[in-house]
Structure formats: structure tokens, C-alpha cells
């Protein structure tokens, strides 16, 4: 039997936030996020010929997930040091989580043309987005910057009752396992180096060079064992003009998941590459910000 899996779709996020500085160098903020999107998954199962030489009967399954959810966040930030030479910032955020109740439409087809529906139904799944606590610190000098974050996610809480079972392999190599949601902890660290942001002669010295590392666990356990996952990142920030903090950001990421228990349980070890490009617009305080939205005046 040959299996072929395919999938496509996307989830879009819109976020609105509001910040307030009640005391000098101390800020609080709130935010609301709305998610929506559709994800389609298809599998094709093609067995060996059973109705005659060269003739096959294939089975096709299609799942469509329609997602919609809203959740909120609060956060605080304290600039312990803030001057022209150094910045030291501490921060924390709390995410309230929310209910993610996807509408799932499942269809099963059989036959070479996949036009005979043998089973089809629509259900609503119950899945809770986790509450999340994140704390971090950031330190910056003229050339160097380093940041550290710790993130805790409460996946196990209200999702603890959702357990699944599965098998891998066959015959003597067949392995049964139980899958359950679990709380996760992740540590992140990144460093940035900018040789000289104000260098007028050497363009590459104005670039920012970045590297990072992330280590944690997946949000599901297999027979009580957690899937470890980690990633390494690298990137550059290309300033839009000399002395500017606004930049075009380019980054790559390589990650692995499940390498610690995949072989023992007969699971697939996952590895991936990501490429990202973005734009950072910096419009800070008047004394050190960039005047993107002010009309120039000439004497």
C-alpha cells in the first residue's frame, strides 16, 4: 500500500494593541488578537492490484478545517538602564488563551475517479489555545545586543482530557502509543552585532548580523515522553539609510523535532528550514527617533 499526503492552507492573524507609560521608563500594554483561516488535508491510499493485473482501487480522504478565534494579552516593560550608551530592559507578557473550535468537514472517496463519496460529515472540535507566560531581558551597547526569553505554555490544562492513540510500524515492529497534550517550556537566546551604524564609507559595517538559538519541547507527549525540539537562526538587518534603526530584515532558521524518541517509538524525525523577510520601522522618541511622518521645513 502506498500513501500520499498533501495539505495547504493558512491562518491569518490581526492584532491591535495599546500601550501606556504611567511612570518614567515603565510601560504597560494590552492587546487583542483575532485568528481565522482554512486548512485542507488530503491523503491518497493506493493498494496493490486486487481486481486484476494493472487495475487498482484507490481511496481518497479529504479534511477541511475552518478556524476562528479571539484572545487577549497584557504586558509590562521596565527600562532599568536607558541612556545613549546602554539599554537594559526587562519585560513580561501574559496571554489569556482562548477557545479554538474548528469546524471540520471530512469526506472519504473511493474509485479511480474519486467521485463516489462513501462517507462525509461535519463536526466541531474542541481545542483550547494555551495560556502563556513569557519573561525576558534585553541588553544593548553601541555595537552589541543580546536578548533572553523564557516562555511557558499551559497546553495540558483544559486540553488534558483529549487523548489519542496510534500505532507505527507493522508485525514485530508494531508500536502502540498514547498521545496527550502537555505543558511546555522554551528558552530562547539571540545576539546581534552592528560594527558601526554611522559609518559613511563602509556599507557592510552598517549592517546588523544576528544569530540565535531556541530549545524546548513539543506540546504533545507519546507514551508520556516529550518530543524535544530545537532551532538555530541567523540573519541580517540592512539599514534603509545611514544611522537609521529602520531596516530590511532577512533571516533563516533550521530546526529539528523528535530526534530524542522518534527511533524508539517508530515516529518520523522532523527537520525543516524557514526563510523570512520583513521590514522594521523605528519611530522612537523625538531625541533619537526617525522622522518618517513629519513634513520637512526649510529656512
Question: Where are the model-predicted features located?
Answer:
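Outer-membrane beta-barrel porins/channels
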Residues: 1-299
Amino acid at each position: 500500500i502506498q500513501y500520499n499526503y498533501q495539505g495547504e492552507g493558512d491562518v491569518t492573524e490581526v492584532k491591535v494593541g495599546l500601550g501606556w507609560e504611567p511612570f518614567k521608563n515603565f510601560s504597560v500594554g494590552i492587546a487583542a488578537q483575532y485568528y481565522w483561516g482554512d486548512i485542507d488535508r488530503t491523503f491518497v491510499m493506493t493498494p496493490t492490484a486486487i481486481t486484476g493485473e494493472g487495475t487498482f482501487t484507490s481511496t481518497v480522504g479529504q479534511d477541511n478545517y475552518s478556524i476562528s478565534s479571539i484572545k487577549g494579552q497584557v504586558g509590562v516593560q521596565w527600562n532599568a538602564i536607558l541612556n545613549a550608551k546602554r539599554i537594559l530592559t526587562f519585560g513580561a507578557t501574559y496571554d489569556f488563551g482562548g477557545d479554538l473550535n474548528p469546524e471540520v468537514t471530512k469526506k472519504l472517496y473511493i474509485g479511480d475517479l474519486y467521485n463516489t463519496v462513501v462517507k462525509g460529515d461535519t463536526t466541531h472540535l474542541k481545542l483550547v489555545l494555551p495560556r502563556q507566560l513569557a519573561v525576558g531581558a534585553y541588553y544593548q551597547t553601541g555595537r552589541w545586543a543580546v536578548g533572553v526569553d523564557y516562555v511557558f505554555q499551559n497546553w495540558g490544562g483544559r486540553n488534558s482530557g483529549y487523548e489519542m492513540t496510534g500505532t507505527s510500524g507493522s508485525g514485530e515492529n508494531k508500536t502502540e502509543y498514547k498521545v496527550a497534550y502537555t505543558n511546555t517550556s522554551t528558552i530562547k537566546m539571540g545576539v546581534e552585532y552592528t560594527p558601526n551604524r554611522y559609518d559613511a564609507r563602509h556599507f557592510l559595517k552598517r549592517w546588523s548580523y544576528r544569530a540565535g538559538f531556541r530549545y524546548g519541547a513539543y506540546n504533545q507527549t507519546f507514551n508520556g515522553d516529550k518530543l524535544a525540539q530545537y532551532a538555530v537562526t541567523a540573519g541580517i538587518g540592512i539599514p534603509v539609510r545611514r544611522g537609521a534603526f529602520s531596516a530590511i530584515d532577512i533571516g533563516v532558521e533550521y530546526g529539528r523535532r523528535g530526534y530524542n524518541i522518534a527511533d524508539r517509538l517508530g515516529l518520523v524525525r522532523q527537520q525543516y528550514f524557514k526563510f523570512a523577510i520583513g521590514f522594521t520601522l523605528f519611530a522612537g522618541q523625538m531625541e533619537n527617533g526617525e522622522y518618517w511622518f513629519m513634513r520637512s521645513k526649510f529656512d
